[in-house]
């Protein structure tokens, strides 16, 4: 008992008496108090306290009740405590009256019989004794604490005193007005009996497994049902609540609606509503039919529903998803263009919405850009190249400009062909990879128109190169790019800055990537530049410049890559429809280096198809790249070109790069290579980092350079992707 007393503070099984008053053991079940713990034990445990019997058993059944009971018991305990300060009297009265009923005889018998129980009873009594003291000062906390603590201590064998104390207190308030323990006891006992029957029998709360278990141990505890009786209203709502929960969760909107409307109990309804934010999904699933029903039953709930319904309505957007290009620019960036419906709008929307292409956004700012971009989007529809360009923009948004980024990509690592292709392939893979083959054909057919549009505007820069560009265009995409190298030479004089600035003039007016390559000496640079320009910037620039000037798009233009000259000269080639197609192939191959490198190993067609897309892109990319993007890419390209600028090698590289396309069309490649050697120097060196290798290899041999250039284009592709 002393141990239990020590535990008292921890787990108050007792209500402590006021410190000024002697320890009176109080029955937790009832106001009965006695200085003799044995009396309390007998009273509480052995049916001496009918309340304790009923309450404890019921509370065992309804473990949740104690706290609720403790709330009311607090009130009861206070009156009880008030009576209990004279708890000696209360004990005398309670013991006399109640014991006269049950306690004296049963208490003594129980004391004798229940020395075993006295351990528990002792716990209770000890708890009660301090509880009496504690009762007046902190009855409300103590009851709850006692309720919570004693069950933990006694576990299965809860002291009826502990749990029932709260229960009794609940009852106590009913009888609390009677200061005498007897008055409280008798009415409480009666009420407890009644509640026990009502709560214990009526509640039908067998859901609490404790009830059958505890009653056997403490049949007297059944009186705890009194507390349950008070709680039972809640319990019943809880029980009804659960079925509605399940039904509603099952999506029985009708059930749920009635449930919400009728509501088993307002308590449950509010929690259920809050809980049933998930109801929205249920309703959402059946929403086609049930939605009206749901809306009728619970508008508040359907606010969530409406939100979810909107969400599903957004879900349809995946197929309507291309209409909101701006919304789904990353996904549908190319797709809306593919539809060709919102090419202009979609292009702008996608560009704007797709901040993924920061550089492309600046290019969009370019006046020409809208047309270019639209063309670009148009080309993506037919060609994967445009998509690859978009993909590269996505990937190269960091690099500089998505379109100008071809140069930027090239300058970072000559990835422009690679980046363009691989990045584009990544994004492009969604729908553009499929489009690529078709795009090759379509690109040549349809893109030539757009390319022509792009190319012809770009032609401003195209000087002598347009003829060469046309020649090379038909002959070799790289050749075309090489031819493009010459006109870019003046523009390329600005080198990368020239690429940015001329890109703005050339691209803005010509819609083509800037010819930043000042080194016309390296035609191979032009060849590599196509690879570099193959990146979005090169793509864009090269289409514009293909019209204006034959671009040296050779992948092998590390030195000339210095000024990643957009295939601006090559764009003029595109000016010619036939040339435009090959130019697209060549220039795009060079520009869209990723596509081109990818295609290079494959064939001119592979190159050509992607270039066609870029040709269309070119207006977009040129405008975009010509502005900020190309400037930025030019800066990057200049840095790279500075790093990789063996101009002689570049000339060789240009030759190698041209031969690479030349492998497809050797003669045009040679012609363009010659043109490019002058112009290729102007070609951005950064277009192809392979150009350094290619330069050496080109010096070794054009064919060797061609083969290795193709391999390097792929290598560059990988590098560009990495960069």
Curated annotation (Swiss-Prot):
Comp. bias intervals (Polar residues): 67-91, 360-369, 470-482, 530-545, 666-678
Induction statement: During epidermal differentiation: expression is activated by p63/TP63.
Positions of CCHC-type zinc fingers: 25-51
Signal sequence extent: none
Residues covered by region (Disordered): 64-91, 132-153, 359-427, 466-630, 650-723
Entries under InterPro entries matching the protein: ZNF750, ZNF750_Znf
Disease: Seborrhea-like dermatitis with psoriasiform elements: Characterized by a chronic fine diffuse scaly erythematous rash on the face, particularly on the chin, nasolabial folds and eyebrows, around earlobes and over the scalp. The rash exacerbate in the winter, with emotional stress and after strenuous physical activity. Hyperkeratosis of skin over the elbows, knees, palms, soles and metacarpophalangeal joints is evident. There is no arthralgia, arthritis or neurological disorders.
Identification of the protein by name: Zinc finger protein 750
Species lineage: Eukaryota, Metazoa, Chordata, Craniata, Vertebrata
Gene from which this protein is expressed: ZNF750
């Amino acid at each position: 008992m002393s141990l239990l007393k020590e535990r008292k503070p921890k787990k108050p099984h007792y209500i402590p008496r006021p410190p000024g008053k002697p320890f009176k053991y109080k029955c937790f079940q009832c106001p009965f108090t006695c200085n003799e713990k044995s009396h309390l034990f007998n009273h509480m445990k052995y049916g001496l306290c009918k309340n304790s019997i009923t309450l404890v058993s019921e509370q065992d059944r309804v473990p949740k009740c104690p706290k609720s009971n403790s709330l009311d018991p607090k009130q009861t305990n206070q009156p009880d405590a008030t009576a209990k300060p004279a708890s000696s009297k209360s004990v005398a009265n309670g013991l006399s009256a109640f014991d006269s009923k049950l306690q004296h005889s049963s208490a003594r018998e129980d004391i004798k019989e229940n020395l075993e129980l006295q351990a528990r009873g002792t716990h209770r009594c000890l708890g009660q004794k301090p509880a009496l003291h504690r009762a007046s000062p902190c009855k409300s906390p103590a009851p709850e604490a006692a309720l919570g603590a004693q069950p933990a201590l006694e576990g299965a064998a809860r002291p009826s005193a502990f749990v029932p104390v709260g229960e009794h207190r609940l009852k106590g308030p009913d009888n609390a007005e009677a200061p005498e323990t007897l008055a409280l006891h008798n009415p409480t006992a009666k009420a407890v009996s009644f509640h026990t029957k009502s709560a214990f029998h009526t509640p039908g709360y067998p859901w609490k497994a404790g009830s059958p278990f505890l009653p056997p141990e403490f049949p007297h505890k059944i009186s705890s049902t009194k507390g349950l009786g008070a709680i039972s209203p809640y319990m019943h709502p809880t029980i009804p609540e659960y079925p509605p929960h399940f039904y509603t969760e099952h999506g029985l909107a009708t059930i749920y609606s009635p449930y919400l409307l009728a509501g088993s109990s307002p308590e449950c309804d509010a929690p259920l509503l809050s809980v049933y934010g998930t109801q929205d999904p249920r309703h959402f699933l059946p929403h086609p039919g049930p939605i009206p029903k749901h809306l009728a039953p619970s508008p508040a709930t359907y606010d969530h529903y409406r939100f979810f319904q909107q969400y599903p309505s957004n879900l349809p957007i995946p197929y309507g998803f291309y209409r909101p290009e701006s919304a789904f620019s990353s996904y549908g960036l190319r797709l809306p263009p593919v539809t060709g419906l919102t090419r202009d709008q979609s292009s702008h929307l996608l560009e704007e919405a797709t901040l993924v292409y920061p550089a492309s956004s600046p290019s969009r700012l370019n006046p020409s850009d809208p047309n270019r971009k639209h063309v670009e989007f148009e080309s993506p529809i037919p060609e994967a190249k445009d998509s690859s360009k978009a993909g590269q923009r996505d990937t190269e948004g960091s690099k500089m400009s998505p379109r100008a980024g071809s140069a930027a990509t090239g300058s970072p690592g000559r990835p422009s062909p690679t980046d363009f292709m691989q990045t584009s392939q990544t994004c492009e893979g969604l729908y553009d990879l499929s489009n690529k083959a078709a795009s090759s054909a379509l690109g040549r057919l349809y893109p030539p128109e757009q390319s022509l549009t792009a190319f012809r505007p770009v032609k401003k820069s195209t000087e002598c190169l347009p003829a060469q560009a046309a020649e090379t265009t038909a002959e070799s995409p790289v050749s075309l790019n090489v031819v493009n190298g010459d006109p870019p030479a003046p523009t390329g004089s600005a080198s990368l800055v020239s690429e940015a600035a001329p890109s703005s003039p050339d691209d803005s007016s010509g819609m083509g990537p800037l010819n930043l390559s000042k080194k016309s000496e390296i035609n191979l640079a032009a060849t590599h530049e196509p690879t570099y320009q193959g990146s979005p910037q090169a793509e864009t620039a090269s289409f514009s410049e293909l019209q204006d000037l034959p671009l040296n798009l050779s992948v092998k233009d590390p030195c000339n890559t210095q000024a990643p000259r957009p295939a601006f000269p090559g764009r003029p080639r595109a000016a010619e429809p036939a040339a435009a197609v090959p130019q697209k192939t060549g220039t795009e191959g060079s520009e869209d280096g990723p596509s081109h490198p990818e295609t290079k190993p494959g064939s001119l067609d592979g190159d050509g198809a992607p270039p066609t897309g870029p040709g269309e892109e070119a207006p977009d990319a040129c405008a975009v790249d010509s502005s900020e993007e190309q400037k930025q890419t030019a800066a990057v390209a200049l840095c790279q070109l500075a790093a990789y600028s063996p101009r002689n090698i570049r000339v060789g590289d240009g030759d190698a790069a041209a031969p690479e396309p030349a492998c497809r069309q050797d003669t045009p490649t040679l012609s363009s290579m010659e043109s490019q050697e002058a112009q290729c120097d102007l070609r951005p060196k950064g277009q192809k980092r392979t150009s350094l290798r290619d330069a050496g290899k080109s010096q070794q041999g054009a064919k060797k350079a061609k083969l290795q250039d193709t391999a390097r284009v792929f290598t560059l592709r990988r590098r560009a992707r990495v960069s």
